[in-house]
Amino acid sequence: DESNLNVFNISNSNEPQFLKMVSVDYHVETIYPFENKLFIGSNNGMFIYDVESSPDSPVKAGEFTHARSCDPVIADQQYAYITLHSGTTCLGFNNELDIVKLNNLVDASLVKIYNLTSPQGLSKDGNLLFICDGADGLKIYNASDVSNLQLIKQFSGIETYDVIAFNNIALVVAKDGLYQYDYSDVNNIHIVSRIGLSNK
């Protein structure tokens, strides 16, 4: 919920069993699981919880504090990618991508900040980083060098909110519908389909 991590046993999906509530921070927004860690985004920062030794009782392993802002987060083996955006109830003023090195979870360090328009959801598949940048549309970067992201493709003309990239297909939630993009060829990333949303 807004300030706690609620742990459930879902081995029986018909009857989920509540196990524990772990206090995290005020205004928790997103949870991103990667390997044996949970990366939790809040208005004030990113919190890292270890679930390797005891999945039913997550233990705080580290955090990274940033300026107050709405905060989606994803991660890979080496870095966390955090988008901050303004113009919401989060009361922040930053519109940026923060890349944080995870070699020391207790003291995660900022690698670089990239200024954006109004970044929200993001996803990563291999070296491709997908960012929904609000009215600037979908931006796709080569992230092989996190200190020097290279923009490969931008799909403008749509207002994007969230993206899931998996197995060469990116599903993008936008203001006017659900878009599907094929990125099997990075030199020819293209739209596959769109399902429109009614404003009624």
Predicted segments, located by residue:
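Conserved beta-propeller blade signature
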Residues: K37-I40, A80-I82, L128-I131, I169-V172
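Repeated scaffold domains used in trafficking and secretory/extracellular systems
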Residues: D25-F34, H66-Q77, L116-D125, I158-N167, ...
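A short beta-strand motif characteristic of beta-propeller blades
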Residues: N14-V22, D56-F64, V106-Y114, S147-F155, ...
